[in-house]
Amino acid sequence: MSIAVFDSGVGGISVLKSLVEVMPNEDFIYYGDSANAPYGTKTLEQVRALTCEHAKELILNQHAKGLVVACNTATSAAVRILREQYPDVPIVGIEPAVKPAMLFMENPRVLVMATPMTIREEKLKKLMDRYRHL
């Protein structure tokens, strides 16, 4: 069984590269949905549908033992739903590095570059609110 890495395009290849370096004895499947990229300009419902469809394929049909959602937009839109749908499968999402930026800087001012959909969603707002006081 493999660990699946999913992104809306090819950006997640850098995540896959790091995973291979850290876990060289694991098998990996990479799926980049270039046909539907970019996800950031789509509606929440569209991103959820695409992400859930690809996760289903990777987990149920490709028998992935874990899933890395290597896309901020897909993470923001669907990672909670995926964790509910597949409680026995470890699912890891990628989020903007707000926490490390806030923790490791004195008097932090952080610029977050993200897709329009990621900016609109509650997940990023909650993350920023959680670390705003630091």
Segments (PLM) and residue ranges:
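Non-catalytic structural scaffold of enzyme domains
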Residues: 1-134
